[in-house]
Regions:
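Short, flexible helical or helix-coil boundary motifs
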Residues: 44, 77-80, 84
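Long, charge-dense tracts
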Residues: 26-52, 61-65
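Bacterial signal peptide processing site
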Residues: 19-20
Length: 263
């Protein structure tokens, strides 16, 4: 099986023994992004580490910028039928995420920057123009989730004021329906699913969190982003414990053979 770039999880390469050249094929990476990626790939693994071979290099692909970029999205929305083209672009990324293992998690890369100030503006613009688009609703929901995180901060709940929590909650009341409706229309849109897990952890909404976790695990069990949520859920700050962290690590370890980036 031929490996294609860009590659994030590199499931195909590790499972079928792709060559070093395939791992480092950057032909699909924009020229402006190649230097930083090459520098990361050239960094040797730490001595004495226990990661699977090349797992560290595989993670370099996580550092790539959002694609399509926020600038590309904003430009397309101003073009005739640009909203339709943008939806098709995201539909293609979604399809490749599940049907071409070498492109797994590029779907998450397509939602990488919507929590930035510019990303929030672009997501609002996209949603305002095509509120019926599941991809636009997921972007808008993710952007608002970013606002909720900013309002709350990252301290323990005991160190977070009621005003911060109230501000967070008001944002999440907007984000949840957007993300849920996006997932209803596109059941495999795992970035929206992961956001719902995040929200469930934030407000200790066990039914929401468990339902989203079950859905994510069923549709996208090898995704780095989905599996990282197991660790977030186990974090003592969100009601977990160190024992739960150990359990989550063991659960993820069972999937490492299929997706070494999870190591």
């Amino acid at each position: 099986m031929k490996c294609l770039a860009p590659i994030l999880l590199l499931t195909t390469c590790f499972a079928s023994g792709c060559t070093r050249d395939a791992l480092e094929d950057m032909s699909a990476v924009p020229a402006a992004d190649r230097a930083a990626l090459q520098a990361c790939m050239a960094t040797p693994d730490l001595a004495g580490n226990h990661w699977p071979e090349r797992a560290g290099k595989a993670r370099c692909w996580l550092s790539l910028p959002q694609n399509p970029s926020l600038q590309d999205i904003s430009r397309m929305l101003k073009e005739p039928q640009g909203d339709l083209k943008l939806d098709r672009r995201y539909a293609e990324i979604l399809s490749a995420h599940f049907n071409d293992p070498a492109h797994r998690d590029l779907l998450f890369l397509a939602y990488k920057d919507f929590r930035t100030e510019e990303g929030q503006r672009v997501a609002a613009e996209w949603f305002a123009k095509v509120p019926g688009s599941a991809f636009a609703r997921a972007a808008r929901g993710d952007a608002i989730l970013g606002m909720a995180w900013k309002a709350r901060g990252h301290a323990f709940a005991s160190q977070t004021s009621d005003a911060q929590l109230d501000s967070m909650t008001s944002q999440l009341k907007i984000a949840v329906p957007l993300l849920e409706s996006a997932l209803r229309d596109e059941p495999k849109l795992s970035p929206a699913c992961v956001d719902l897990i995040d929200i469930g952890n934030l407000v200790d909404a066990t039914p929401l969190r468990d339902s989203a976790m079950q859905h994510c695990s069923a549709i996208d069990p090898l995704s780095w982003h989905v599996n990282s949520m197991y660790l977030t859920e186990a974090d003592p700050r969100w009601g977990g414990s160190f024992d739960k962290i150990d359990q989550a690590v063991e659960q993820i370890r069972l999937r490492v053979k299929e997706s070494p980036m999870l190591a």
